[in-house]
Amino acid sequence: MIATDIGIDLGTASILVYIRGKGVVLKEPSVVAFDRDTNKIKAIGEDARLMLGRTPGNIVAVRPLRQGVISDYTVTEKMLKYFIQKAVGKKTFRKPRISVCVPSGVTEVEQKAVEDAAYQAGAREVAIIEEPIAAAIGAGIDISKPCGNMIVDIGGGTSDIAVISLGGTVVSTSIKIAGDDFDEAIVRYMRKKHNLLIGERTAEDLKIKIGSAFKRPEVEYMEVRGRNLVTGLPMTVKVSSEETEEALRETTSQIVEAIHS
């Protein structure tokens, strides 16, 4: 019987699975697609994401995690079990030891929900680690030293800000402003500035490719296709990195304020 040690970053937008000795073996969206008529799960992760917009209206997408915590326990449990089995494979193995990252501001009840979901998904042992600690270790910082390290971990649903020293968290805060809010800000900006309706995936592409929190020395451009809110017809707009900086300014400033406080 083969024992496995697994690390899971249970994010609002995506899930990463790490296996000791192999590294990150899986990164997929935290999305579950299910049939609204039968209430049965049709796909999980990347397969679920690919189904969106290409399937009948009875297929809907669910994000079982919201702002870093479980919003749908049953679906989260099934999603975790699916990803663990996919990462480990079909071979016979002892129940794995699992470490799961959670935002620094989660309550005991929320933490217990994550722990229970991991056990129900097949864990032998479960360890809960605060995301800033995991981020610091992953960045190669020696957190055992007697000096302060500030960590800012911007996820999909939450941003964690912490000062870490001597192996522990000195002070921390978790705000529910993060990557999803950047996407929504871009969607709002495109609607207001260009009368163009775009989806979350298109907004995320814009953010990743030319998104900026400050003015760049060189302006970058990207063509975006959506629906004209005036005519209802498809329309393509050329968007600049200067525009994304403007779109993200308010959301970025909220994270900066949290860091300063």
Which residues make up each language-model segment?
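Nucleotide/phosphate-binding catalytic cleft detector across ATP-hydrolyzing
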Residues: 1-154, 162-261
